[in-house]
A protein has these predicted regions:
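Pepsin/retropepsin-fold aspartyl endopeptidases
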Residues: 1-127
Length: 127
């Protein structure tokens, strides 16, 4: 099975810090945005709670949830919470919450995502 990969622009909206580009896997079966601990530390996102998460293999673990993650992808932008994953083998995981909020569609034939052309969401202007 092929994987859809994207580049995310992420910054801490609470500190108005720098924007970093982070590669991510798009996972329509995942619910939340997941970031590696290294990115969370680099950008200084605050932990707002701990939450039990369930993985695809049915394992459960307690993970920190951070806030203030401003994320831009496909010229769409929003602020999200993210699960902190201490030992990730990939940079980030883009789940359904971000996809739905930003009204993005997965194109499985081309292995990409794009904004819903019928969306009523405004497009972000990129300078």
């Amino acid at each position: 099975v092929e994987v859809v990969n994207v580049e995310l622009k992420i910054r801490n909206i609470l500190t108005q810090g720098p924007t970093v580009e982070v590669p991510a896997k798009v996972d329509t079966g995942a619910t939340l945005l997941v970031l590696p601990q290294s990115v969370v530390r680099e950008l200084g996102f605050p932990t707002i709670r701990k939450q039990t998460v369930k993985y695809a293999n049915e394992e459960r673990a307690d993970r920190e949830i951070v806030y203030g993650v401003e994320l831009e992808v496909c010229d769409r932008r929003g602020v999200f919470e993210a699960v902190v994953e201490p030992e990730k083998t990939y940079a980030a995981l883009l789940g359904a919450v971000v996809m739905e909020t930003l009204d993005l569609i997965v194109e499985p034939r081309d292995f990409r995502i794009y904004p819903n052309p019928r969306s009523k969401l405004p497009m972000a202007e990129i300078e």
